[in-house]
């Protein structure tokens, strides 16, 4: 997956996450202290993981849960995030981990994430997640299973393309209306001033 699909996917999921974040700020069953959100050792799985976290989160603790993957865009939706504690989870290294792998690749330091190891599939068991290639993650998907990460990226690009086309159409329509109004105003002003100019010309000739 190239950088453009990831960028479009991240943008779309960022908007969705901001729209769906909990009104209370600190999502259950986590605890919060300032901008630190602690969801560690709460038995969280993909299904029970909070859909979003406060956008000003600077430190997120997900250590010691039952997470095999993270929803795409979950970490990208936290622009202030400086540290994510993700150890002691049974990560399944297949195409579902592509968003997390991309997020890790963008971190300035990989040392804090060297304890992230693949538990499955057998071919990748024990491997350090930050050093598993994207092609290896894609290849780990079951035969015939479309990598939903790539599918979401394509859908995101389609939605963004449609939004851009709609915005362009609205801007062009607005521009046409402004030009039509300016033309009508010019014609109206000319129709008002032309008789005065003609009358002034006749007066000067006499």
Swiss-Prot record:
One of its GO terms (cellular component) is glycoprotein Ib-IX-V complex. Residues 89-143 form the LRRCT domain. Residues 173-206 are cytoplasmic. LRR repeats lie at residues 60-83. SMART domains: LRRCT (SM00082), LRRNT (SM00013). The modification Phosphothreonine is found at residue 193. One of its GO terms (biological process) is cell adhesion. It comes from the Eukaryota. PANTHER family: GLYCOPROTEIN IB BETA, PLATELET GLYCOPROTEIN IB BETA CHAIN. This is Platelet glycoprotein Ib beta chain. It comes from Mus musculus (Mouse). The gene is Gp1bb.
């Amino acid at each position: 997956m190239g950088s453009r699909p990831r960028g479009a996917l991240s943008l779309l999921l960022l908007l969705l996450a901001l729209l769906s974040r909990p009104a209370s700020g600190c999502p259950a069953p986590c605890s919060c202290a300032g901008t630190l959100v602690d969801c560690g050792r709460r038995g969280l799985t993909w299904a029970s993981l909070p859909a979003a976290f406060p956008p000003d989160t600077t430190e997120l603790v997900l250590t010691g849960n039952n997470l095999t993957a993270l929803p795409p865009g979950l970490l990208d939706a936290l622009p202030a995030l400086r540290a994510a504690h993700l150890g002691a989870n049974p990560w399944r290294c297949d195409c579902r981990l592509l968003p997390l792998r991309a997020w890790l690749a963008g971190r300035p330091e990989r040392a804090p994430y060297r304890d992230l190891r693949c538990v499955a599939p057998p071919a990748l068991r024990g491997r350090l997640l930050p050093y598993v290639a994207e092609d290896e993650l894609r290849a780990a998907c079951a035969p015939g299973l479309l990598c939903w990460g790539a599918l979401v990226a394509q859908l995101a690009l389609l939605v963004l393309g449609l939004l851009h086309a709609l915005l362009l159409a609205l801007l062009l329509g607005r521009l046409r209306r402004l030009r039509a109004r300016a033309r009508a105003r010019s014609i109206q002003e000319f129709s008002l001033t032309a008789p005065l100019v003609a009358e002034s010309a006749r007066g000067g000739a006499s």
